[in-house]
Swiss-Prot record:
Protein species of origin: Mycobacterium avium (strain 104)
GO biological process, one term: pantothenate biosynthetic process
Cellular location(s): Cytoplasm
Reactions that this protein is recorded to catalyse: 3-methyl-2-oxobutanoate + (6R)-5,10-methylene-5,6,7,8-tetrahydrofolate + H2O = 2-dehydropantoate + (6S)-5,6,7,8-tetrahydrofolate
Entry protein name: 3-methyl-2-oxobutanoate hydroxymethyltransferase
Annotated cofactor note: Binds 1 Mg(2+) ion per subunit.
UniProt biased composition (Low complexity): 9-21
UniProt binding sites for 3-methyl-2-oxobutanoate: 66-67, 105, 135
Keyword DNA damage: no
Xref: HAMAP family: PanB
Assembly with partners or alone: Homodecamer; pentamer of dimers.
Binding residue positions for Mg(2+): 66, 105, 137
Listed GO CC annotations: cytoplasm
Amino acid sequence: MSEHNVYGAAQPAQPAQPAQPRTRIRTHHLQKMKAEGHKWAMLTAYDYSTARIFDEAGIPVLLVGDSAANVVYGYDTTVPVSIDELIPLVRGVVRGAPHALVVADLPFGSYEAGPAAALAAATRFMKEGGAHAVKLEGGERVAEQIAHLTAAGIPVMAHIGFTPQSVNSLGGFRVQGRGDAAEQTIADAIAVAEAGAFSVVMEMVPAGLATQITGKLTIPTIGIGAGPNCDGQVLVWQDMAGMSSGKSARFVKRFADIGGELRRAATQYAHEVAAGVFPADEHCF
């Protein structure tokens, strides 16, 4: 079978090239991407169906975030969500994403007490949830926990800058690392890298500071409200796809209106059922 070029002339059909099999993304793949200057995207996921779609789209890292507290369970902050509420979500995401690296958030209260508590929490996510790595919030103050987890063979993604679990002590949703506070943010980044974290999320950090930190670290940086020069970017998928209600954060770009489409579909479905239009003959046995 022939194909046509842009001018309409037939071209000989080319033999199909075998597709390169995709393999599971591992932490060393992210390190290689940083070394080669390749930027990559990370999204949150909380269930099998969306994880499957994102995996098919080639998203290399999926985060089962404690943001599930807000978008799955309806809490006002991430503070109330528990390990028992998150582990079933991790299981679904791992099943739906055969290629992505699946990272599980350690929720508030599960690791602050020290290395032993962090190891107990992380072990549950790895054994019961099937996660490939865990994420925890904090810089220098959690370096000991990070070192303990990595020594136990558990890959750790760190999270500095604005840390949502600390929203009460930070005085609300505020940019971190401005002015004199920049030195502490840099110190936090260096501390988590030296403790063995394989990557670090920087949230709501001035773009210039994030660029500086990205250049200092050998591990990948992942930005959310931290400018364009991080090695990766992450968004909550409901924000990215237009499922969230209310005003979006400044760092969010909506790439679709899934919420509007779903609302229209549900409205049309209800209308057709009420009108006796659905199910039609073609939907019957």
